[in-house]
Amino acid sequence: MKRILFSTALLMAVSFSFAQVKNVKDAKSIVNGSDPDFTKAESLIEAALVDPTTKDEPNTWNVAGYVQKKINEKELESAYLKKPYDTLKVYNSSYRMIQYFLKCDELAQIPNEKGKIKNSYRKTNAPILLIERPNLINGGVQYFNLNDNKKALEFFSNYIDLATVLMLEKENLLKQDTIIPQVAYYACLVAARIEDYPSIFKYANTIASLY
């Protein structure tokens, strides 16, 4: 009887694992369709991001970033066609996309059982991060104007912090990006508004180190 129960439980676990893998594939397929249901795609991939069977797979996070990329492209298409579009949706999509691709890269950098690193995602995703990074300023400014200082700080701080991630180290952004001190100033400003003193100290030091 115990053996039967164990076998049943094992079968259910395997079935659920396959279901989450299918969710990842389905999410990507949906956003690539002619009439994508982005809400459904996000729901599928978000379930996979927290499930033990798929949350540690780089591809899960890569697809999550890809879903956000397609959402972003759809909104920008509407803007190009002079149709109504949601600017905050664009900025938040860029923010999430960047976080997902960073997590994908982190997991892909873990050596395999032979001690080798086979990161097949960085070459494609690093240029996307560079393209989307300015939207972190745009989003920060919009949240600043809406007096949502916590969200503004999230956007400004992520813009600055991206300059030092391994994924973009070849770009030497701390030296090449002359806007960083200005963004750091605004990060300090919104941090002061919410009395986030560690962030004030952190980004004040960023400003000092770049002058």
Predicted regions located by residue number:
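Canonical tetratricopeptide repeat
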Residues: 63, 172, 179, 186-189
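Bacterial Sec-dependent N-terminal signal peptides
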Residues: 1-29
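Structural signature of tandem alpha-helical TPR/SEL1-like repeats
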Residues: 195-202
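Generic helix N-cap/helix-start motif at coil->alpha-helix transitions
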Residues: 19-23, 96, 131-136, 176-186, ...
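Post-signal peptide N-terminal segment of secreted/secretory-pathway proteins
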Residues: 32-151
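Conserved structural position within tetratricopeptide repeats
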Residues: 47-50, 106, 161, 205-209
